[in-house]
Amino acid sequence: MRIPPRLVALAGAAAVAATLIAGPVAAAAPASHAVAASSAASASVKAVGRVCYSALPSQAHDTLDLIDEGGPFPYSQDGVVFQNREGLLPAHSTGYYHEYTVITPGSPTRGARRIITGQQWQEDYYTADHYASFRRVDFAC
């Protein structure tokens, strides 16, 4: 069984908190690099868009529930690393994103709909067009 990425993220957050309590680390990127990285991430996030959780198809709700429960998932490909080859999501190292199928009723295949999860809490993206566009799920609406 795969460990859902958001559980790994919570463990990582605990490790970061422990490190911060123990003392700061004196290693930081030069300011020019930090600004460039921040600008690139902001531009990418703006290109993604948002979608209200309530506006998602019911099958996307089912997929998000399965992710939170750790499965079982309907397809063996569910939970695999999403490579972000399109470069539409914010840039992160390989393994940061994972993809899950959103079942498309009547489709003989997995269809085009997916949920992509990041490692942050509620960092979920929906695509209805097989990675041509993404919308971050807004759980507040």
From Swiss-Prot:
**Its principal location?**
secreted
Q: Does the keyword Signal apply?
A: yes
Cystine pairs annotated here are: 52-141
Return the InterPro entries for the record. N1-like, Ribonuclease/ribotoxin
EC numbers: 4.6.1.24
Q: Which UniProt keywords apply?
A: Disulfide bond, Endonuclease, Hydrolase, Lyase, Nuclease, Secreted, Signal
Quote the catalytic residue positions: 99 (proton acceptor), 130 (proton donor)
What cellular component GO annotations does this protein have?
extracellular region
Please tell me which top-level EC class this enzyme sits in: lyase
Look up the signal peptide feature and give its range: 1-36
Recorded GO MF terms? lyase activity; ribonuclease T1 activity; RNA binding; RNA endonuclease activity
Intracellular or extracellular location(s): Secreted
Q: Which SUPFAM superfamilies does the UniProt entry name for this protein?
A: Microbial ribonucleases
So which domain of life are we looking at?
A: Bacteria
Name the catalysed reactions.
[RNA] containing guanosine + H2O = an [RNA fragment]-3'-guanosine-3'-phosphate + a 5'-hydroxy-ribonucleotide-3'-[RNA fragment]
Spell out the family assignment given in the record's similarity comment.
Answer: Belongs to the ribonuclease N1/T1 family.
Protein's name in the database: Guanyl-specific ribonuclease Sa3
What species was this sequence derived from?
Kitasatospora aureofaciens (Streptomyces aureofaciens)
